[in-house]
């Protein structure tokens, strides 16, 4: 199970990476989440400009097995979505790279640091 050390994680199996500008973050689903979902066939996300509250639903992932809600890992404004998601299988093949989901202008960068670190996330999923 791939759990990069430089990311932060939620109990809902999303990851967050604060970008170098310190106010924007990328977010996606974890390797664990994509493996549990199975083959992802479609991703639906709210539009850029949407204000997000932490833990609020911001989209859905449709897999062969199921449809799952996506929860905002942090509060902020959704400022971008990954255009590569037209080929939704990229979430399965590269969940931490090309398969990122959204870019968020964060309300509070410190909130990212309050999320789970890699060791805590490993413990959560029993890895």
Curated annotation (Swiss-Prot):
The modification N6-lipoyllysine is found at residue 65. Coiled coil: none annotated. One of its GO terms (cellular component) is glycine cleavage complex. GO terms for biological process: glycine decarboxylation via glycine cleavage system. PROSITE patterns: BIOTINYL_LIPOYL, LIPOYL. Keywords: Lipoyl. Its cofactor is (R)-lipoate. InterPro entries: 2-oxoA_DH_lipoyl-BS, Biotin_lipoyl, GCV_H, GCV_H/Fam206, GCV_H_sub, Single_hybrid_motif. The glycine cleavage system is composed of four proteins: P, T, L and H. Belongs to the GcvH family. NCBIfam families: gcvH, PRK01202.1. This is Glycine cleavage system H protein. It comes from Chlorobium phaeobacteroides (strain DSM 266 / SMG 266 / 2430).
